Regions:
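Formylglycine-dependent sulfatase
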Residues: 1-287
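Single conserved hydrophobic/aromatic residue that forms the stacking wall/gate
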Residues: 286-295
Length: 295
């Protein structure tokens, strides 16, 4: 797909140059949960009717379907994994599973309390901090979809009179994520998984077990929250970013435009319908995905 001309991605380029890139690869669903369960089970969402973020193993069709992990395991593979692979994980599928998916680090306000979650990045203006839940998911603002900004020292920063800090995500119970500077900070969840994968590969190489293995590592980014070390933001000064070309009148035939210009009552399409509230883009650019395979 070539990517953005200003994107600095040496590792992806190295993988692409040494593997095969598929120019017409399409996601099975434009949100992560049903897309992952479809990809790893081989069952299309329109056959399973699993379109939303409910646990895939509670779906009648998928509950009676074996994932690729189970298939490998049944055929003598040692299957190990870590990170965000299936949106809702079942550890019993694996021979060994290390870290559950963690979307952190996230901003945290005040003292840690049971049931208390993170907040939007402190640089996000207050009007855009409001959370709006649709089913199980927040589709507007908040710690996940309402966060964009750099990791920075917030030791002396308060918001609404409360001290700010950084925290790992919910799977780690919002454990403190220590950050003083880029040279003095905890590892991000993706970095933890990368280190684990490297160690696991070396461990398997030294093992006397001759069985083949299947290893899956699920890196979170570029999934929201869009929080990363400052050095990555410094690579792209806002005043130098080239904006994408947009065709004239390109937005005139969208679903939301139809609703607004034709005065369609929201009740007709469902006030709480995920199609309307999430405004999940279903277009060519959102259904295509970069797919590279290296053997």
């Amino acid at each position: 797909l070539k990517g953005h001309p200003q994107a600095i991605t040496p590792n992806i380029k190295k993988l692409s140059d040494s593997g095969t890139s598929f120019m017409k690869a399409y996601t099975n669903n434009p949100i992560c949960g049903p897309s992952r369960s479809s990809f790893l089970s081989g069952i299309y969402p329109h056959n399973s009717l699993n379109f939303w973020q409910k646990p895939w193993y509670n779906n009648d069709v998928l509950a009676n379907t074996k994932t690729i992990v189970e298939k490998f395991k049944e055929n003598g593979y040692y299957v190990v994994g870590s990170g965000k692979i299936l949106h809702h994980n079942k550890k019993e599928l694996w021979s060994e599973f290390e870290h559950n998916s963690d979307l952190g680090p996230v901003a945290y306000k005040g003292k840690k309390e049971k049931g208390k979650i993170g907040i939007s990045h402190p640089d996000i203006p207050k009007p855009f901090r409001t959370e709006r839940m649709v089913g199980c998911c927040n589709m507007n603002g908040g710690q996940i979809d309402g966060s964009f900004g750099p990791l920075k020292n917030v030791e002396n920063t308060k918001l609404d009179g409360e001290q700010l800090s950084w925290a790992y995500g919910g799977s780690r119970g919002y454990k403190e994520f220590k950050y003083t500077s880029e040279d003095e900070r905890d590892l991000t969840p993706d970095e933890i998984n990368a280190q684990w994968a490297e160690d696991k590969i070396n461990e398997l190489a030294r093992s006397d077990n001759d069985s083949p293995f299947f290893l899956a590592v699920g890196f979170v980014r570029p999934h929201t929250p869009l929080i990363a070390p400052q050095k990555y933001f410094d690579m792209y000064p806002l005043e130098k970013i080239e904006l994408a070309n947009i065709l004239e009148n390109d937005m005139d035939d969208t679903f939301l435009n139809y609703v607004e210009t034709n005065n369609v009552e929201k009740s007709e399409v469902g006030e709480n319908n995920s199609t309307l509230t999430h405004k999940q883009p279903v277009s060519y650019t959102h259904l295509t995905l970069p797919t590279m395979i290296r053997v």
